[in-house]
Amino acid sequence: MKVTNIYNLPQALVDAVTTEKHNKDGEYSATTLLKGECETILTKRHWNEILVDASESIWQIFGTATHAIFEAQKDNTFKEEFFSVDVSNSKVTGRVDSYDLENEIIVDWKTASVRKVIKQNFADWKRQGLIYSWLIKKCGLNVKKCRFIALLKDHSKADARNKADYPKQPVYVYEFDVTAEDLAEIETFIEARVKALEFADTLKDEELTPCSKEERWTTPEKWAHMKEGRKSAIKLYDSEEEAAKVELKKDEYIEHRPGENKKCDNYCNCREWCPLFKKEVEC
């Protein structure tokens, strides 16, 4: 991956975001398993061709700094411990932020947006925590609980005072107990994902299966019933036919809101090689 600096940012910032690590051949990290197969394979194949501007990676510095600060704390835990387990013809790896051996708890530090907390959108964190738990279990240790401590980078005191569903503090803790059923389910997921990645690696770029809608962060198109002077929709409709049935008043109108693949359009570094993205651009 090559880091550009089109906005002429200080070199220290550029250097700080040029430390992105890449999986070794035959290895898949816990976070890699959470990505789409297409993205994972294309990233590996085109790693040396990918261009990312330093300005697009600033939040990466916050995450790295957060981990460094808490890694330096002295307590009775393993920190930044690396685990590796053979799966099929590959290895699944994970570097755990902190593992409390006495209480059998994994702690992972995150930087996150307030929106994630409001939406309670923690499915990816839970799956990541379970992969770590599975790795640790396979290495002879036990995990009773996973705890994610998130620093909310866009927290507003004013919104915390005035909005009922807004997190009251700029820190949020998400945790869950790890059960035997959880570990059995995540093992099935890991084995299936690794085998799927191994097969995908034998395909040409244009033959790769596109990432799922969930992996592409897809939002469907909508038709919004709007009123002049009002920012939010009165009601959203899934089809133009539904919206056409609305009896509009004088100051009302229907607004079409196209769907989008937010990750593909804004955050995927290998989209120029992606068969689905190429097809959508051509259309």
Where do the language-model regions lie?
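Metal-dependent nuclease catalytic cores that hydrolyze phosphodiester bonds in DNA/RNA
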Residues: 1-106, 113-126, 137, 158-167, ...
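Metal-dependent nuclease catalytic regions and adjoining charged, substrate-binding loops involved
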Residues: 1-7, 135-283
